[in-house]
Amino acid sequence: MTHDSLSPVAAPAVHSGDALARLAAVIESRKPANGGDADKSYVARLLHKGPDAFLKKIGEEATEVVMAAKDVDHGADASKLVYEVADLWFHSMIALAHYGLAPADVVAELERREGTSGIEEKALRKSLQRAAEEAQP
């Protein structure tokens, strides 16, 4: 797959939908409003502390993804990158749940973008922004 297009290329089969849905359900059950106990659950603790706590974790995990990818560039085992991406996804799923969203919302957005060049999409966004600015009095 090229970096500027989301056109499908022979990719390995992905069987993550069920796992993501199960994890999303667990995260949802750990919300304080659903009885999540911050003393017994890491997810409940992050959600109880509020957005600053889980957003900080997302930033940390994103940095760890970058560092792991750089390590792979220098010969490290790629499984470390997978491990760090899993942490990033997990904490991102906590944010999604907090804001009333689910992995299915992200999948729907990726499907919407499928087959669209990133360059074309960026140009369209700029065009729409320009039109909105011109429409303002």
From Swiss-Prot:
Segments for region (Disordered): 114-137
Protein name: Phosphoribosyl-ATP pyrophosphatase
Family: Belongs to the PRA-PH family.
Gene3D superfamilies attached to this UniProt entry: MazG-like
EC numbers, comma separated: 3.6.1.31
Pathway membership, UniProt: Amino-acid biosynthesis; L-histidine biosynthesis; L-histidine from 5-phospho-alpha-D-ribose 1-diphosphate: step 2/9
Main subcellular location: cytoplasm
Any single GO BP term: L-histidine biosynthetic process
Source organism, top-level taxon: Bacteria
Location(s), subcellular: Cytoplasm
Keywords: Amino-acid biosynthesis, ATP-binding, Cytoplasm, Histidine biosynthesis, Hydrolase, Nucleotide-binding
Bias (Basic and acidic residues): 114-124
GO cellular component assignments: cytoplasm
Organism phylogeny: Bacteria, Pseudomonadati, Pseudomonadota, Betaproteobacteria, Burkholderiales
InterPro entries: HisE (IPR008179), PRib-ATP_PPHydrolase-like (IPR021130)
NCBIfam families: histidine_hisI, PRK00400.1-3
GO MF: ATP binding; phosphoribosyl-ATP diphosphatase activity
Catalytic reaction(s) noted: 1-(5-phospho-beta-D-ribosyl)-ATP + H2O = 1-(5-phospho-beta-D-ribosyl)-5'-AMP + diphosphate + H(+)
Record-linked Pfam families: PRA-PH (PF01503)
